[in-house]
Amino acid sequence: MRLSAQLTNTKLADEEVPELASVPDGVSRWTGADLDRLRSAARRGGVGAEQQDLEQKLCRTIDILGARSQKTQGINAVLTSVARLRESNTFRLYLLTQNHRGVGILKMGVKKLFVTHPVTCGLVEVDPLCVLDFYVDESCQRQGYGKQLYAHMLDAEHVSRPELLAIDRPSDKLLGFMKKHYGLTAYTPQVNKFVVFHGFFGHTTVSERGKLLRTTSPTGAAAAATGTKAKNEMPG
């Protein structure tokens, strides 16, 4: 990232988060398409000043919290912004608000990954739902907001087991969060820096083309259909 962009994001991170008067406290979900609809409605006119105000302040909130996340993690590239949300229709952002101000973000999206299988030690292709960015404002940490945000996401995404998610470059703090709240610790280090817990591979088999297939049981019909050997399977 160019130095000018880094300075811009640092300045943005220091801005005060605007009040979102029309957004109820709790967790809301936003996609690039949602934000585009808000922007289009505001530009067309015919909407009240309140809606125009929401579009501007919501987008600013997302950009500020994304910049704060980048600053906290000490990384060069911003992971969450309105522009980044528009890059893929699989991206969705969970925004946590308290007292009508954004205090946390959780960005999710589907990615195609090649990861090392913990049993065969070979590369397999997976396309999991991924945690791409997770941030709670420093002033609101250790108050249960992170767990509230994560639990809401799991429910909204219909994820029955947290280990079915992949996490992009998690910090030690996030790994500690996963251990504390979900008992997840075992994973094989990956070249791409994603963390995929060993439980992700439960009830799976590997096709002849190297794609991980999920079965209903360790000896499910998918294994028979692909002709994959049972030794490539992981128990649940």
Curated annotation (Swiss-Prot):
Write down the chemical reaction(s) this protein catalyses. L-lysyl-[alpha-tubulin] + acetyl-CoA = N(6)-acetyl-L-lysyl-[alpha-tubulin] + CoA + H(+)
Q: What InterPro entries would the database entry show?
A: Acyl_CoA_acyltransferase (IPR016181), Atat (IPR038746), GNAT_ATAT (IPR007965)
Keywords for this protein: Acyltransferase, Transferase
**Segment Disordered: which positions?**
217-236
Ranges where the N-acetyltransferase domain occurs? 21-201
Gene Ontology terms, cellular component aspect? microtubule
* Residues marked Crucial for catalytic activity (site): 73
Under Enzyme Commission nomenclature, its number is: 2.3.1.108
The yes or no answer to whether the keyword Metal-binding is present is no
Q: Which GO terms describe its biological process?
A: regulation of microtubule cytoskeleton organization
Q: Where does acetyl-CoA bind?
A: 134-147, 171-180
Annotated signal sequence is: none
| Pfam families registered for this protein in UniProt | Acetyltransf_16 (PF05301)
UniProt cross-references to Gene3D superfamilies, sorted A to Z: 3.40.630.30
Residue ranges, compositional bias (Low complexity): 219-229
Report if keyword Nucleotide-binding is assigned: no
Example of a GO MF term: tubulin N-acetyltransferase activity
Q: Outline what the protein does.
A: Specifically acetylates 'Lys-40' in alpha-tubulin on the lumenal side of microtubules. Promotes microtubule destabilization and accelerates microtubule dynamics; this activity may be independent of acetylation activity. Acetylates alpha-tubulin with a slow enzymatic rate, due to a catalytic site that is not optimized for acetyl transfer. Enters the microtubule through each end and diffuses quickly throughout the lumen of microtubules.
What family does the Swiss-Prot or TrEMBL record give for this protein? Belongs to the acetyltransferase ATAT1 family.
Checking PANTHER family in the record gives: ALPHA-TUBULIN N-ACETYLTRANSFERASE 1
Its protein name is Alpha-tubulin N-acetyltransferase
Source organism per entry reads Leishmania braziliensis
